[in-house]
UniProtKB/Swiss-Prot annotation:
This is GTPase Obg. It comes from Yersinia enterocolitica serotype O:8 / biotype 1B (strain NCTC 13174 / 8081). Monomer. The gene is obg. One of its GO terms (molecular function) is magnesium ion binding. It is an enzyme of class 3 (hydrolase). It is found in: Cytoplasm.
Length: 390
């Protein structure tokens, strides 16, 4: 199945049903009181995280979702039926952004997580709500409000413990093939990897971690060169990054400059991502020999001013790969399992009609208590529209 990690959808919640103006009419009861019921609330729209999905391709074709409108109120104090909700399934790891405001509506990080993204309109009130000691036969009602409309950007971010960085042909796909059952394509030309891939590294029967391989970066990626930096977002939730440096580039380029390119592109993309724990891994030591590899590695470390630990491996021959994986496993075990992305939790999203119910009923009660003022035609100051019927 084609991997799609971005999609834009339109969600429209259902409108609220209108209130009803009606009076009780039965035999021997010529002057019955008001019995107009309230309308039904509009349907809401939810997102549901599903671990069985791994792409957003479905929403490249179906881009609009509309919930059901609430039914109008009826006589005999019958409340209108509530509109049906809509639930949209998305892969675990999906981030939801409001295109209109730019706010993060939520992060779908757990299987079964449910998130409301559009709230249905509030129901209108029937004339029964407006009866009082000074208004025995109210002929006013309120209309249902409109449901929320949002244009959402869905971004799928892979959930991995370890992320891999490097130029094209640095050996990232070879490494992930060596340590896991994943089989990304490997060839001797740039950009063999076109989409992100995940591999599970099993150290023993009880311990494992997930590693993410993304397409290689090149200089100018932040300006759109190559495949750009659109795949770097998949590393935001990783707890540690492995920066692979080719000790023997096939194009005879300078490994120091190659390493600086990746560091520079990382900083231009996100300061938070640039500050993540990052390990330097020198690959392809089998092509230059152990002694020459050590000399080149030390020269690169000095040129970069690197103060952390570095590793020397051959992903193709699996030299020193197992030791690196165990160090990664021990590092992950020593870190909290909280989300690695270092940003504040999104604020609570305010929906259009959150306080509508309380405000509207408070207005009705205030009108009922005001015995010296029964002018129901007075314009409402709070914007609640009353409809009068004769």
């Amino acid at each position: 199945m084609k991997f799609v990690d971005e999609a834009t959808i339109l969600v429209v919640a259902g409108d609220g049903g209108n209130g009803c103006v009606s009076f009780r009419r039965e035999k021997y009861i010529p002057n019955g009181g008001p019995d107009g019921g309230d309308g039904g609330d509009g349907g809401d729209i939810y997102l549901l995280a599903d671990e069985n999905l791994n792409t957003l391709i479905d929403y490249r074709f179906v881009k609009s979702f509309r919930a059901e409108r609430g039914e109008n109120g009826q006589s005999r104090d019958c409340t209108g039926k509530r509109g049906k909700d809509i639930t949209i399934k998305v892969p675990v790891g999906t981030r939801v952004l409001d295109q209109g405001t730019g706010e993060i509506v939520g992060d779908m990080t757990r299987h079964g997580q449910r998130l409301m993204v559009a709230k249905g309109g509030f129901h209108g009130l029937g004339n029964t709500r407006f009866k009082s000691s000074v208004n025995r036969a109210p002929r006013q009602k309120t209309m249902g409000t409109e449901g929320e409309t949002r244009e959402l950007m869905l971004e799928l971010l892979l959930l991995a413990d370890v992320g891999m960085l490097g130029l094209p042909n640095a050996g990232k796909s070879t490494f992930i093939r060596a340590v896991s059952a994943a089989k990304p394509k490997v060839a001797d030309y740039p950009f063999t990897t076109l989409i992100p891939s995940l591999g599970v590294v099993r150290m023993d029967h009880e311990q494992s971690f997930v590693v993410a391989d993304i397409p290689g970066l090149i200089e100018g990626a932040s300006d759109g060169a190559g495949l750009g930096i659109r795949f770097l977002k998949h590393l935001e939730r990783c707890r540690v990054l492995l920066h692979l440096v080719d000790l023997a580039p096939i194009d005879e380029s300078d490994p120091v400059e190659n390493a600086k390119i990746i560091i520079n592109e990382l900083q231009q993309y996100s300061e938070n991502l640039a500050q993540k724990p990052r390990w330097l891994v020198f690959n392809k030591i089998d092509l230059v020999g152990p002694e020459e590899a050590e000399v080149r590695a030390k020269a690169i470390v000095e040129a970069l001013g690197w103060e952390g630990k570095y590793y020397m491996i051959s992903a193709a021959n699996r030299d020193n790969v197992n030791a690196l994986c165990w160090d990664v496993m021990n590092f992950l075990n020593s870190q909290p399992k909280a989300m690695a992305i270092a940003e504040s939790a999104p604020e609570k999203v305010e929906f259009m009609w959150d306080d509508y119910h309380r405000e509207q009923l408070a207005e009705v009660e205030a009108e009922a208590e005001s015995e010296d003022d029964d002018d129901w035609d007075e314009e409402d100051d709070d914007g609640v529209e009353f409809i009068y019927e004769r």
